[in-house]
Amino acid sequence: MEQERVKKALERFRNHVISQSKRNLTRTQKNSSKKLYNSIKGDLKVHQNSFTLEFSMEDYGVYQDAGVSGVKKKYNTPYSYKSKMPPSKAFDKWITRKGLAPRDSGGKFSKRKSLSFLIARSVYRNGIKPSLFFTKPFEAAYKNLPEELIEEYGLDAIELFNEQIDTILENG
């Protein structure tokens, strides 16, 4: 397969994965700060006898994609909360962006710090449900790669996907 066709096929693959991943983030409402959305990138380098295609995103994107098991609710994921809760401070800006204003039984506003703690405890117990915002477009785009490209370069989808996740975790 000539190099120019390989490059075009891989560019289409990269662009499809990125655009669909961003679309999924927006559709599943996991895009409140736009930080993860804006961080999804793909770097393609085609050489004489090989190519490299690396996807990158914010570290926490891997956990949003694969999910995290809580102490009470389990998901099919390698990640889990065991003994430490996520820091409640991490949810403070999210609460503000979402416009959540908690009230007590008397109708008075309660402290945002209390709500942050309750959300952190809920995430610790119930985990983060896998969204597969990146996994699904990656696998779908892989199926649409030209067969000769897969055969010539010996591409294995699972191995390729696992390498991408490892790269994201290492570079983040």
Predicted regions and their residues:
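Charged, low-complexity interaction tracts
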Residues: 35-172
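Charge-rich, low-complexity N-terminal segments
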Residues: 1-46, 50-52
